[in-house]
Every structure is written in structure tokens, then in C-alpha cells.
């Protein structure tokens, strides 16, 4: 990822190097908790139902606690019955957001912070990108998460 904007003093030209080439896509599957912790998985390429199912089974469910609420948007794999059954067996409640409602999704705020970090990191290889993603995810704090949940209209009881 490259930065989209920059600043310089008046009368100077902004110069930055951005490679030109054909890139493969990288997908980050992640969750966020009020304490700022995440359960993330990074893959090269796009995701589908089988990849999302593996994420839920091996990464997300082990990080969940009974009585947790999992909020998901309307991406097709989020609605597959076997994924919903796995989450129900884990003892969590599943909420689906209305269509086209990123304003209600706190993880969208997290992606904004992650993307800003990744643009600044200027990773130019898969390994460098994976390391940068790990560092970016570790920058998420409990204060960030609480602010994002509050901004999206969620009310919660602090323990």
C-alpha cells in the first residue's frame, strides 16, 4: 500500500517513490474485542467460505468467551449455516448488521488505522507486509476499541 496524500512546505514539490507493478491481493481476517485484542489471520489472495470457515474454527472460536457477541456484516460467507452453527456451539450470540451499514461496524474504524500504518510502512514484499500487519494489529489499544464501539453506537458495561 502506498500513501495517498502528503504534506510539504509551500512552494516545494512532494516526491515519494511508489512502485509500479502487478500485485497479488492480501486478505486480513480479523475480529476486535473491547480490550483491543484481535484474532487475526492473513492469507495471500481472496477469501471464500472455506477460508472463512477455517478462520472461525481455528482462530476466532478459540479466542471467544461464553456470552460474547459476534457482530458481522452481510458478506456472504458470514451467513453460511455451518459457520453460524459453529458460533452458536461456542456459546456466543451472532448479530448481523443491516446491509450497507459500515457506520455500525467498529472494525471498519480499526481498518482505517491499520491501513494508515501499512501505507506508512511501505512494505514491498509479502514477508515484509505480513510483519507490518502484525505490528499494525499490535497498535490497537483498549482505548481505540472502546472509542470505536462507542462511536458506532454500542453501549457496554465496563468490568
Where do the protein language model's features map onto the residues?
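RNase H-like polynucleotidyl transferase catalytic core
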Residues: 14-20, 90-106
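Extended, low-complexity cationic-aromatic segments
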Residues: 1-57, 154-155
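A structural preference for long, well-packed, hydrophobic secondary-structure segments
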Residues: 50, 54-66, 86, 93-101, ...
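C-terminal anion-handling pockets and recognition modules
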Residues: 106-159
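Acidic/histidine-rich, metal-coordinating catalytic segments
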Residues: 66-79, 100, 105
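Anionic group-transfer/hydrolysis microenvironments
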Residues: 35, 75, 115
Amino acid at each position: 500500500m502506498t500513501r495517498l496524500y502528503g504534506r510539504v512546505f509551500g512552494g516545494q514539490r512532494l516526491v515519494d517513490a511508489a512502485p509500479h507493478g502487478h500485485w497479488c491481493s492480501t486478505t486480513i481476517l480479523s475480529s476486535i474485542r473491547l480490550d483491543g485484542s484481535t484474532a487475526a489471520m492473513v492469507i495471500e489472495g481472496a477469501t471464500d467460505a472455506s477460508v472463512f470457515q477455517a478462520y472461525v474454527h481455528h482462530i476466532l472460536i478459540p479466542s471467544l468467551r461464553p456470552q460474547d457477541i459476534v457482530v458481522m456484516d452481510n458478506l456472504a460467507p458470514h451467513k453460511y449455516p455451518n459457520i453460524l452453527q459453529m458460533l452458536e456451539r461456542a456459546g456466543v450470540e451472532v448479530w448481523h448488521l443491516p446491509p450497507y451499514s459500515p457506520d455500525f461496524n467498529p472494525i471498519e474504524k480499526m481498518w482505517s488505522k491499520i491501513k494508515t500504518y501499512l501505507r506508512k510502512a511501505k512494505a514491498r514484499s509479502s514477508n515484509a507486509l505480513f510483519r507490518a500487519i502484525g505490528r499494525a494489529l499490535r497498535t490497537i489499544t483498549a482505548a481505540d476499541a472502546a472509542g470505536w464501539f462507542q462511536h458506532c453506537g454500542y453501549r457496554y458495561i465496563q468490568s
